[in-house]
């Protein structure tokens, strides 16, 4: 097992060849955007803030923009394809099911970011261009990454609209929760084919100047039956973190193999969301119908011995099936949903950090065994 951590010095940050401001949006291509928006409003406590559709001139697609803190999700479905983009989205849903089509990144200079990326080997999907409305101007560009996923580069300096030109402000679908369920996107995890993890890690190293933050291989990321490998790349400020997983050869089909089969190739596996109160988050999401992975009671029998004291009592962690991990910098609390659609593909992680910038290394075995139990129920192990 190897785990490496790299802390980028301030001088390197100042010379960052691909500066980022953070995640701009996670964009989903879905079969029914209205129903998806309602689900994430009720089950995830998100707030509908913007809309684009036939009522305001978009004849081809309907899109709903939801926010929670700094996290922004966009759900888009095709009404009737009339351009290459609409045809692509329709085919994306047909092949992959509901899934992430775009991990949009906010940058201070979209033209410079696009030029640097293309110069260093990225495939351009959209040249830098301006879009305008009464709220100001946004510069957009896009590059390809693994599978059919893209990174739209968004420069929105001075823009004060609800999302982007072409969108109008929208009223929430449901009454917002008394307490925000989550505050930000923590990281976005991609699954790629066997033998391609290092290729895509190298892509982010070259194209965006991201550094390797952590690496997980060996026994700590394997069970009796299945295994995988993972490396994490991040920008110099750690605002954007992308773990990349690939399957490893083992006795049975791993969770990565299952994803690749049912998604139809590489793509975004899960999105981790920061919360400052994971207990309230899990209680609210469970009450709204979200299903989480189960953890055996035996996990909690010795938890206090190796994880130490946390702000949440062990009996509450046991009740809610929340996992704990601790490293030299602190600890984290985390829990994973089951897939949020019928295909066993995209799911979510809720994470509460107390110093630790890790990814739950100590929980990998318990997590993977929980996923294997679900795979076995589906007949996919």
From Swiss-Prot:
Binds 1 Fe cation per subunit. Residues 22-156, 184-338 form the VOC domain. Pathway: Amino-acid degradation; L-phenylalanine degradation; acetoacetate and fumarate from L-phenylalanine: step 3/6. Keywords: Dioxygenase, Iron, Metal-binding, Oxidoreductase, Phenylalanine catabolism, Repeat, Tyrosine catabolism. It is an enzyme of class 1 (oxidoreductase). Disulfide bonds: none annotated. This is 4-hydroxyphenylpyruvate dioxygenase. It comes from Streptomyces coelicolor (strain ATCC BAA-471 / A3(2) / M145). It catalyses: 3-(4-hydroxyphenyl)pyruvate + O2 = homogentisate + CO2. Homodimer. NCBIfam families: 4HPPD. InterPro entries: 4OHPhenylPyrv_dOase (IPR005956), 4OHPhenylPyrv_dOase_C (IPR041735), 4OHPhenylPyrv_dOase_N (IPR041736), Glyas_Bleomycin-R_OHBP_Dase (IPR029068), Glyas_Fos-R_dOase_dom (IPR004360), VOC (IPR037523). The gene is hpd. Its EC number is 1.13.11.27.
């Amino acid at each position: 097992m190897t785990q490496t951590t790299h802390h980028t010095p301030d001088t390197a940050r100042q010379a960052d060849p691909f500066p980022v401001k953070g995640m701009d949006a996670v964009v989903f291509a879905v079969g029914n955007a209205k129903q998806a928006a309602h689900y994430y409003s009720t089950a995830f406590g998100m707030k509908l803030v913007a809309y684009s559709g036939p009522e305001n001139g978009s004849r081809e697609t309907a899109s709903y923009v939801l926010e929670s803190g700094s996290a922004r999700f966009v759900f888009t479905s095709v009404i009737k394809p009339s351009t290459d983009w609409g045809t692509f989205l329709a085919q994306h849903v047909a092949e992959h099911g509901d899934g992430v089509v775009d991990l949009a990144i906010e940058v201070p200079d979209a033209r410079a970011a696009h030029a640097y990326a293309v110069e260093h080997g990225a495939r351009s999907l959209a040249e830098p261009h301006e879009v305008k409305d009464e709220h100001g101007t946004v510069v957009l560009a896009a590059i390809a990454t693994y599978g059919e996923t893209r990174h739209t580069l968004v420069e929105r300096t001075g823009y004060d609209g609800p999302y982007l030109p072409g969108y109008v402000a929208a009223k929430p679908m449901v009454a917002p929760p008394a307490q925000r369920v989550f505050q930000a996107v923590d990281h976005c995890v991609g699954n790629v084919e066997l033998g391609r993890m290092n290729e895509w890690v190298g892509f982010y190293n070259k194209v965006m100047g991201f550094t390797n933050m952590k690496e997980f291989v060996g026994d700590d990321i394997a069970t009796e039956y299945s295994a995988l490998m993972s490396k994490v790349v991040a920008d110099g400020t750690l605002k954007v973190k992308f773990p990349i997983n690939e399957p490893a050869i083992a006795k049975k089909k791993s969770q990565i193999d299952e994803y690749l089969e049912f998604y139809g190739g590489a793509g975004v596996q899960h999105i981790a969301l920061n919360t400052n109160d994971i207990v309230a988050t899990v209680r609210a999401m469970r009450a709204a119908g979200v299903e989480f992975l189960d953890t055996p009671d035996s996990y909690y029998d010795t938890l206090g011995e190796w994880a130490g004291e946390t702000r949440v009592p062990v009996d509450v962690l046991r009740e809610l099936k929340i996992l704990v991990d601790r490293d030299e910098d602190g600890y984290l609390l985390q829990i994973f949903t089951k897939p949020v659609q019928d295909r066993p593909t995209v799911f979510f992680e809720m994470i509460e950090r107390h110093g630790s910038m890790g990814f739950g290394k100590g929980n990998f075995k318990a997590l993977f065994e929980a996923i294997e139990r679900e795979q076995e129920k589906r007949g996919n192990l």
